[in-house]
Amino acid sequence: MTTAAAFDRGASRYDLLVGLNPGYHRELRVAAEALVDRVGHRPGLRLIDLACGTGASTRALQRAAPLGTEVLGLDASHGMLEQAGRASWPMTVRFCQAVAGELDVAALGPGSHHGIMTAYLYRNVPVQLRDKAVAEVYELLAPGGWLVVQEYSVAGDSRARVVWDAVARFIIIPLGVLLDGNHDLYHYLWQSVVEFDSVTRFADRLVAGGFEDVAHRTATGWQHGILHTFVARKPREKS
């Protein structure tokens, strides 16, 4: 089963399960506000929510952005997009199916977006395509545009690994089985975090991809040291 197919299967119960995490929506708001604060509260903004899932991150971005901001939600999973489409959205928000690492940058508009937010995407991108996926968002951003990435990472942090393993094995996977019957998806989510880049390694990917002003912070609460928010800027054009 592909990753997209696994998310298709779990789409109908996904919001219920992630909503049981008390910090989930708060951290999405933090990421969305971090992006909008950096691109500026101004008319005519064009933003992308890459790996928008069921639209929770899109909603956070839409609420943080000025009225009239264009927000494009992209996701590989048809099932997730179907769930997102059931909600009520302003005319300036739309959704489209697309796969990170295989984006049609020319069709999406290279250099035409002021900001891109992506939550829980990069660990789902095959390692051999990760740098390409970073390059795609770089190409989509306008000069001076900002990228905000929210992602789990425990590599190189033994305390974070112990906490994550315990939460995944004794809470996430059992709840996933109980509420959704989808053991494979939640076991995959556990392992995808374990196998993902360290914080330093991912930050280095962003720098290698041409980004500057790369910084990161970790979440509060039980996710401290596990969930991280990265910010990075595409250089402005030299005058």
Task: Describe every region a protein language model picked out.
Residues 46-104:
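Class I SAM-dependent methyltransferase SAM/SAH-binding core
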Residues 152-205:
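C-terminal alpha-helical "lid/dimerization" subdomain adjacent to the S-adenosyl-L-methionine
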Residues 114-129:
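A short SAM/SAH-binding and catalytic strip from SAM-dependent methyltransferases
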Residues 131-143:
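A short glycine-rich, Lys/Arg-flanked "PGG" loop and its adjoining helix->strand segment in the class I
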Residues 209-212, 218-239:
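Core SAM-dependent methyltransferase catalytic element
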Residues 101-116:
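A short acidic, Gly/Pro-enriched loop at the edge of an enzyme's catalytic core
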Residues 1-41, 56, 60:
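Conserved class I S-adenosyl-L-methionine
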Residues 144-151:
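Conserved beta-strand signature within the Rossmann-like core of class I S-adenosyl-L-methionine
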